[in-house]
Regions:
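C-terminal membrane-associated helical module and adjoining short loops/tails
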Residues: 1-6, 165-222
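Cytosolic, membrane-interface loops and tails of multi-pass inner-membrane proteins
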Residues: 2-3, 7-37, 93-108, 160-179
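Alpha-helical transmembrane segments and their lipid-water interface positions
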Residues: 19, 85, 94, 119-122, ...
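Membrane-helix interfacial "entry" motifs
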Residues: 29-33, 37, 41, 62, ...
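Multi-pass membrane catalytic core of lipid/isoprenoid biosynthesis enzymes
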Residues: 33-52, 92-140, 144-147, 183-197
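Membrane-embedded alpha-helical segments that form the functional core of polytopic membrane enzymes
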Residues: 38-93, 143-148, 206-222
Length: 222
């Protein structure tokens, strides 16, 4: 990736995290490239959040109940992202649920199958997200939907901040671990300020509590 172009980093991130039919990136995934791609993940979140908010807005003008709209948004985001985060959540919870030593946890997480703990986590996370989307749709909190999805993706940046080592010595995690500056924590604060400014112009004004609650939910389960 020449000069770590932000545009190229976003291109790689979109290709990696979504099913959007962009040209296949031709880059060498070294540590510098991987770090730039991780930094671009919240931009993908902004794209996904905009799609989710626009879909919620359109569906809110139909006869569909908001609960069903929430479910459709969760399913839609899972399809757009290849279910990558859903699969990762299941692997993580299955690993933690085995109550074994670190080696056993890593083995379970790499198995590729979904166990009872992982299945329960998927159902619980999907239900929480659907209820959250439904509540925000019912109150016409379109900016909060975008904000929540963006901050949910920003969790990946925080997980790769300096000072945190990789779980394994090989793989993509080893490439990107510790590549993000700690100062990047200011971005969620900027996003919150931006959401407050934009949300104030929406119907009924802006309620920071909704954005914070929604963002917290998506950071935990996205």
């Amino acid at each position: 990736m020449k000069h770590h172009s932000p545009v190229r980093a976003i291109h790689v991130a979109v290709s990696w995290l979504t099913v959007v039919p962009v040209p296949t990136p031709t880059v060498e995934m070294d540590r510098c490239t991987g770090g730039a791609v991780i930094t671009a993940v919240p931009v993908v979140g902004a794209l996904l959040g905009t799609v989710a908010a626009a879909s919620a807005f359109g569906l809110s003008h139909t006869a569909l109940p908001t609960a069903l709209i929430g479910v459709l948004l969760v399913v839609g985001l899972a399809l757009i992202t290849r279910g990558m985060h859903v699969d990762g959540l299941a692997d993580t919870v299955d690993g933690l649920g085995c109550y074994g030593p670190p080696e056993r946890v890593a083995e379970v997480m790499k198995s590729g199958s979904v166990g009872p703990f992982g299945a329960a986590a998927i159902v619980a996370a999907g239900a929480v997200q659907a209820v959250g989307f439904a509540a925000l749709t019912d109150q016409h909190r379109w900016y909060d939907i975008v904000f929540a999805v963006v901050v949910g993706r920003f969790a990946a940046v925080l997980a790769c901040r300096r000072g945190l080592g990789p779980a394994a010595a090989t793989g993509f995690g080893a490439i990107v671990a510790g590549t993000q500056r700690r100062s990047l924590i200011v971005w969620p604060i900027i996003l919150l300020a931006g959401a407050a400014t934009l949300g104030a112009a929406g119907p009924g004004g802006y309620d920071a509590a909704h954005a914070v609650a929604a963002a917290t939910t998506f950071v935990v389960v996205a």
